[in-house]
Amino acid sequence: MISDNLKKGVSRAPNRSLLKACGYTDEEIEKPFIGIVNSFTEVVPGHIHLNTLAEAAKKGVYANGGTPFEFNTMAVCDGIAMGHEGMRYSLPSREIIADTVESMAKAHGFDGLVLIPSCDKIVPGMIMGALRLNIPFIVITGGPMQPGELHGKKYDLISVFEGVGEYNVGKITKEELMEIETCACPGAGSCAGLFTANSMACLTETLGLSLPMCATTHATDAEKVRIAKRSGMKIVDLVKEDIKPTDLLTKESFENAILVDLALGGSSNTTLHIPALAYEIAPEFITLDDFDRLCDEVPHIASLRPGGDHFISDLHRAGGIPAVLKILEQKIRDANTVSGKSIKEIINEVKYIDYNIIRPVDKPVHETAGLRILKGNIAPDGCVVKISAVNPKMYKHEGPARVFNSEEETIDAILGGDIKEGDVVVIRYEGPAGGPGMREMLSPTSAICGMGLDDSVALITDGRFSGGSRGPCIGHISPEAMAGGPIAIIEEGDIIAIDMMAKEINLKISEEEIKERLANWKKPEIKVKKGYISRYAKLVSSANEGAVLK
């Protein structure tokens, strides 16, 4: 065992002495060391209940002959960080979390890990760190929040964001907005729709890194506690059998996850996180081109928020991820999982599917997969749109560019009534390095939707979007403006042509004009001069490479 390096032999008496200072007995020190990576915090609703899951996981570890050691990582709430300087820290926090997991596990000789994340960047961050170590681990995702209810209608956080736009154009009163604000998020859990947190939980289960039904089981359900306890027991088995992530994860495992993502209409942020996870195994293991190739393989089979009407709680009652895998069975490749069962064995155990929630592939919600990769002279290295959340009339759009160099400028223009039907809003210098931090543009997109412009106005950016964004929102444009990408030379009034079905996005000027503008472009200074974000801006890769540090 790895832990033998710090606890065996006479020379390790000082190490054992310090462990005994923590209250551990000789018998406990002899057992496998299991790190319990808890991201509990009192400021993130998706994480306020994680202490309960950590306690259950520790009981499971003890029950199966291991010794648990709990430690914490940070957790950022994207919703609370939204719309201000805090959002610069959201995506970069993923790398801090990965480094924390790596550092703590290496420093203390853990033989295996139980990861307990919930929200957007914490799920991929923890997994990235664990993959880097290549030691046995299992993931307990925190679980979804229930939707709120008011006057017989269901709400979630996106309802509140869009409510701001509705209030601004007089559709609702301030009192009605306050009612929605108060009811929309009723308690613990990651936001109730198929936004980034729940998308990543679903893909974690598909990858075989968490137990079946973990992703969709509600945050405070007793079954989630039982899953946590069983996960604690299972990690001891994985350590004793020396089953590492590289024994489980293959190219096919990642392709399964992408297929589920595309079929469900998951968050566009998955095109950052899945390549970033794969990068920890091998560079170029999974790229944006894999998403592009696979998006023609499956239709969109679930009408989940933000593009549809159903919530993750509905997906759970419909059969969860095993049911989705069952419906996609002809496309899914077999792979091993931490449960000890293969993907095909999990599929064969499915007993119930609600086809009103998870549609058969021959009767899909949309014939087109939920995400689409576009390329063109604006985005030579690609960009992404969550097409499942786009009105079909906007699949093809051509209009004049309204150019802004920050999110703040854009919001002022939208709420000030300066954006008109037919416009293409361009937000640049918001990429991984340009932001820095690649902020989510949820406030601008929600304002556009709330004001009723989502069926006539497109928005493109080198930044990214919340998993809760809907409408014709095209993000991750690569190369980003800060790297001298063509988005940097778009001028006010230029005509932009978007054709989602053809996978194209182009600036309607000549190649000669593009070359001339690029030759005259001057790189601006980094917006943040000190601290972590300034260092991040110097090291981060392009969005089409997962925005990893290199």
Curated annotation (Swiss-Prot):
Its EC number is 4.2.1.9. [2Fe-2S] cluster binds at C119, C191. The keyword Iron-sulfur applies. The keyword Ribonucleoprotein does not apply. PROSITE patterns: ILVD_EDD_1, ILVD_EDD_2. Mg(2+) binds at D78, D120, K121, E440. The active site is at S466. Its cofactor is [2Fe-2S] cluster; Mg(2+). GO terms for molecular function: 2 iron, 2 sulfur cluster binding; dihydroxy-acid dehydratase activity; magnesium ion binding. InterPro entries: Dihydro-acid_dehy_C, DihydroxyA_deHydtase, DiOHA_6PGluconate_deHydtase_CS, ILV_EDD_C, ILV_EDD_N, IlvD/EDD_N. GO terms for cellular component: cytosol. Keywords: 2Fe-2S, Amino-acid biosynthesis, Branched-chain amino acid biosynthesis, Iron, Iron-sulfur, Lyase, Magnesium, Metal-binding. It catalyses: (2R)-2,3-dihydroxy-3-methylbutanoate = 3-methyl-2-oxobutanoate + H2O; (2R,3R)-2,3-dihydroxy-3-methylpentanoate = (S)-3-methyl-2-oxopentanoate + H2O. It holds the Pfam family ILV_EDD_C. It comes from the Archaea. Binds 1 [2Fe-2S] cluster per subunit. This cluster acts as a Lewis acid cofactor. Belongs to the IlvD/Edd family. Homodimer. NCBIfam families: ilvD, PRK00911.1. Functions in the biosynthesis of branched-chain amino acids. Catalyzes the dehydration of (2R,3R)-2,3-dihydroxy-3-methylpentanoate (2,3-dihydroxy-3-methylvalerate) into 2-oxo-3-methylpentanoate (2-oxo-3-methylvalerate) and of (2R)-2,3-dihydroxy-3-methylbutanoate (2,3-dihydroxyisovalerate) into 2-oxo-3-methylbutanoate (2-oxoisovalerate), the penultimate precursor to L-isoleucine and L-valine, respectively. This is Dihydroxy-acid dehydratase. It comes from Methanococcus aeolicus (strain ATCC BAA-1280 / DSM 17508 / OCM 812 / Nankai-3).
